[in-house]
């Protein structure tokens, strides 16, 4: 497996010199900051104080899902390349520290509920007055304005409001969520785009009146980031009154493009030797994977006058029924599927030839997508009959030879064993402080001259508190006093003149 040595501080990234304050927690804000840090930004993560040895305080994500040595392994992905400053933002002394850090920062990222920053006396407009070049990224469920601004918002709720949840289901069944936090991640990536745009504007706005350029506030709403990816949903409704409904594994309006069951069954075991496996045991104290808290109550009510699920743009495209030629599966086993995208006109003909149905490929009524959509059930059934007689590997080999886009539905075991993932550096091996090795996703995107790099492992809570505060001019005695009063944490007895405790500016 390809590995990325960790850490490697000698290579400067494209964002080297960019100073970022991250005041977020959980996913959206921290993911945005992590993306900037991967490409060289100097990121200080501010999180609630506590006792790192006892596992108290800090970003709640430190305790999410499976834990190793008391800390989530997800933490090693979400907080790599960052520094940790443990600070109680409710305290006036902590708020003053944030103002001092903001005065020397380029970017501040926060994802609290609207009004929280203002309640701490840290309103973005006031911070920008102190530092006119400061860029503030604000991520929230519903945005900083509008009638819903004060509602609490998780990514899962944003996915529902943004239109995604309605589409992720089998026709006529309960909508299901995507298996990861797409709403948060999409908002984070939109936020990163906003930061880069604001940096470009700051550079372009340099003038005698603004010698360092002008900063600004970026307002990202989780639901809007989801809605921005909803393709033609709104114009179809505007032009035709069409409400797209769930289509299961099919791609609505495109044929054929679906998941088809094969002869073999799905396994969670690696497909080949050399896959990435955990070298250390998972904490038994962690219990089952810790799920994200679900919104209270049942289904979200629709506004009065909203269009019901019965409205539809044409006939629903059903997922193909199990084919007659498949072998019976063992009780509790899961069938293995392949995704086949034969929706190009010439691709469709090659696909039909490969599955032994050249008659469908030669049918003039199926020569284009519009005709195929009308008969999608017939086409899916023909493909499903063929895939059910073969294993996934046989199907993929045949379609690859025919030039038909297709792929297996990967489990993480498949990913960990896949040579393409390995060749692209997407299976990074991180050496932990205890000497163990942890596999984490590599960095994207891939830049030819200035690629991202894993420079630092994720910090322990307050690991950099002393050094950061020394950089602001505080003495070791003053810093210890802040810790004694519960305002900061992470300060350990050390020689103040040592490299690890000597101050460094933001």
Language model segments and positions:
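N-terminal helix-loop segment corresponding to the beta1-alpha1 unit
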Residues: 1-207, 211, 460, 466-506
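Short, well-structured beta-strand/strand-turn elements
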Residues: 43-46, 400-414, 475-480
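Short Gly/Pro-enriched turn/cap motifs at secondary-structure boundaries
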Residues: 67, 75, 247-252, 258-259, ...
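Conserved Rossmann-fold dehydrogenase catalytic segment
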Residues: 144, 172-181, 203-226, 243-252, ...
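Oxidoreductase and adenylate-handling cofactor-binding alpha/beta cores
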Residues: 188-214, 228-241, 352-356
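Aromatic-enriched alpha-helical interface/lid elements that frame and gate functional surfaces
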Residues: 256-271, 277, 327-402, 406, ...
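Long, intrinsically disordered low-complexity tandem-repeat segments
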Residues: 270-333
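A glycine-rich dinucleotide-binding beta-alpha-beta segment and adjacent secondary-structure elements
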Residues: 401-455
């Amino acid at each position: 497996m390809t590995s990325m040595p960790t850490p490697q501080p000698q290579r400067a990234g494209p964002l080297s010199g960019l100073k970022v304050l991250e005041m977020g927690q959980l996913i959206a804000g921290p993911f945005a900051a992590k993306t900037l840090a991967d490409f060289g930004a100097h990121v200080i993560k501010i999180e609630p104080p506590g006792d790192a040895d006892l596992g108290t305080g800090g970003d709640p994500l430190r305790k999410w899902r499976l834990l190793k040595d008391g800390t989530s392994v997800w933490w090693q992905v979400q907080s790599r390349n960052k520094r940790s400053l443990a600070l109680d933002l409710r305290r006036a002394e902590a708020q003053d520290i944030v103002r001092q850090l903001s005065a020397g920062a380029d970017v501040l990222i926060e994802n609290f509920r609207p009004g929280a920053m203002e309640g701490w006396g840290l309103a973005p407009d006031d911070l920008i007055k102190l530092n006119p070049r400061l860029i503030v990224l604000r991520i929230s469920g519903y945005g900083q304005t509008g009638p819903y601004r004060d509602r609490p918002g998780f990514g899962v709720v944003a996915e529902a409001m943004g239109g995604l949840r309605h589409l992720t289901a089998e026709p006529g069944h309960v909508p299901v969520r995507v298996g990861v936090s797409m709403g948060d991640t999409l908002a984070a990536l939109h936020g990163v785009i906003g930061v880069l745009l604001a940096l470009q504007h700051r550079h372009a706005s340099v003038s005698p009146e603004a010698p360092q350029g002008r900063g600004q506030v970026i307002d990202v709403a989780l639901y809007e980031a989801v809605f921005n990816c909803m393709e033609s949903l709104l114009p179809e409704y505007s032009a035709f009154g069409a409400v797209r409904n769930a289509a299961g594994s099919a791609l609505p309006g495109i044929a054929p493009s679906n998941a088809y069951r094969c002869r073999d069954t799905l396994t969670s075991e690696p497909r080949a030797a050399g896959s990435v496996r955990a070298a250390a045991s998972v904490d038994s104290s962690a219990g089952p994977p810790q799920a994200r808290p679900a919104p209270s109550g049942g289904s979200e009510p629709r506004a009065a006058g909203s269009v019901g699920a019965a409205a539809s743009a044409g006939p629903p495209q059903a997922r193909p029924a199990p084919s007659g030629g498949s072998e019976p599966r063992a009780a509790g086993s899961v069938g293995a599927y392949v995704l086949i995208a034969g929706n190009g006109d010439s691709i469709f003909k090659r696909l039909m030839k490969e599955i032994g149905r050249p008659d469908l490929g030669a049918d003039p009524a199926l020569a284009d997508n519009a005709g195929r959509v009308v008969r999608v059930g017939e086409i899916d059934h023909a493909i499903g009959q063929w895939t059910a007689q073969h294993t996934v590997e046989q199907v993929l080999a045949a379609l690859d030879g025919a030039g038909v886009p297709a792929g297996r539905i990967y489990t993480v075991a498949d990913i960990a064993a896949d040579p393409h993932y390995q060749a692209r550096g997407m299976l990074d091996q991180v050496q932990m402080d205890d000497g163990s090795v942890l596999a984490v996703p590599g960095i994207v995107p891939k830049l030819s001259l200035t690629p991202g790099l894993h420079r630092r492992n994720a910090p322990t809570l307050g690991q950099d508190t002393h050094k950061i505060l020394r950089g602001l001019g505080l003495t070791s005695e003053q810093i210890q006093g802040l810790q004694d009063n519960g305002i900061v944490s992470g300060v350990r007895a050390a020689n103040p003149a040592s490299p690890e405790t000597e101050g460094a500016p933001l």
